[in-house]
Amino acid sequence: MAKQNLKSTDRAVQQMLDKAKREGIQTVWDRYEAMKPQCGFGETGLCCRHCLQGPCRINPFGDEPKVGICGATAEVIVARGLDRSIAAGAAGHSGHAKHLAHTLKKAVQGKAASYMIKDRTKLHSIAKRLGIPTEGQKDEDIALEVAKAALADFHEKDTPVLWVTTVLPPSRVKVLSAHGLIPAGIDHEIAEIMHRTSMGCDADAQNLLLGGLRCSLADLAGCYMGTDLADILFGTPAPVVTESNLGVLKADAVNVAVHGHNPVLSDIIVSVSKEMENEARAAGATGINVVGICCTGNEVLMRHGIPACTHSVSQEMAMITGALDAMILDYQCIQPSVATIAECTGTTVITTMEMSKITGATHVNFAEEAAVENAKQILRLAIDTFKRRKGKPVEIPNIKTKVVAGFSTEAIINALSKLNANDPLKPLIDNVVNGNIRGVCLFAGCNNVKVPQDQNFTTIARKLLKQNVLVVATGCGAGALMRHGFMDPANVDELCGDGLKAVLTAIGEANGLGGPLPPVLHMGSCVDNSRAVALVAALANRLGVDLDRLPVVASAAEAMHEKAVAIGTWAVTIGLPTHIGVLPPITGSLPVTQILTSSVKDITGGYFIVELDPETAADKLLAAINERRAGLGLPW
């Protein structure tokens, strides 16, 4: 495959693209080519559809029209568009969290018998952080108060959002408060963005962007809350060994992919699938093989060792194997095309949420009150599909990688405690100080069809690891790295610099692994970016410095979704240099671009690094880490 035509660096995906071409199946890459040339006004953020006088578009070269019909400038139009993306992303993550809050509430009230408190320790830790009394209280009563506190954080109230003010270092909360950036309520901030960006409201670009920063913290609250509540209900992840890539599918099994984001559905599917093995065998299968796609795949991977099939932009490839019997969907990052592809592959596509249906898919409404019954109904559809598929040819790439995952914040602290039980963070801090660990980089976000799949993630990670940067990853960024072997401990010698190698080996051996931790630590799904925040906040608190002084950076190397926009923005807002590897729709306004890549540093300490070349991006991330080290008086 010629380099200029490279669609994916994943060999399994390349094999399926060849199959799709032979069979005349249109994929996401074909649709991207058909869409070219894409609208330059949209790409630069210079189009506006916020009222019925439009659409308006601004000339990017300085000629007329220089303002919209209402008089909105390029700066205002670009800032409003960015704000709405942040709000949409926050709505996604916080909707996920709200779903979990309602599920926890139903569980402890006896209305959803399939769910229970799985992690009592995490429950008590969260309650203590929120100021909820636990002494002498029943776990169910504590959990109910946690659920109520979570739901209260969605509304405007006199007290600020707890899932912001109690999770960040006090020094960071002070900075954010001084600039009016602490959200009053998650839903409140989303609604206010929609209000202030409507026609006739906020027409000051800097003020609009400050509103966007505040709304992004509502997204952080949704992420952190989603992680907390999922851990209470389904357990806090601990290290687990599994596999990834299309090779995890099995020709002779009922192959079921859970796809989307919320473990409320996928965790039950995993549990019930074990009960239905005999039904699958009676249909002629060897059993039920549950695999994951995207973030709900990450959820069940890190808690149950469920293998990851594929991620993000390549989700259609699982179906093109011909071996996928059912794709079970909840919400977010699901391409509507899966229903069309299913017509070619025979896969049964099953939607489960009232707010996320797809024309052509089978809908089974999933209710927590009837979770087991709904799961059985869904899995029987998969078994029926297998009966129709049995005996037909399939093409499953013989490609898969070993994955060691499940590195929640608690798991990392526990691993470090084997080196220093009294002060678990000290070994990490000592190795940052002595240079064995140069800094930390969080890889987050999606794949984007505009970038050869996984290329940016793997190129940047490879360079950072050689420079002794500790790499953690979430979401489909984690998926990209796992499918290329970055989460296999056997690859530490090849991928890591000597200092990082020594640290990973010392921790692994202290924990009885007989070898190192993997080169990249998988911290979970996209909401689990909160785990990285928890880790760096603990480091900041331990050192007595704010987040904007730590040698910590983030990269959304192949960002696609509005949720990635929100995540990147709150990373900047809490003080992190944050790389974006695709062109964001802000370049139509030089002032907006300058604010986000430079001036915002004076407010939050963080800033965006927009760099499409992955080699150069790695250099810029290293430079940001070195600058932070110098600021702390550390050698680099």
Swiss-Prot record:
Protein name: Carbon monoxide dehydrogenase 2
GO cellular component: cytoplasm; plasma membrane
Cofactor (UniProt): [4Fe-4S] cluster; [Ni-4Fe-5S] cluster
Localization (cell): Cytoplasm; Cell membrane
Cofactor: record remark: Binds 3 [4Fe-4S] clusters per homodimer.
Complexes and interactors: Homodimer.
Listed GO MF terms: 4 iron, 4 sulfur cluster binding; anaerobic carbon-monoxide dehydrogenase activity; hydroxylamine reductase activity; nickel cation binding; peroxidase activity
Activity control, per UniProt: Inactivated by O(2).
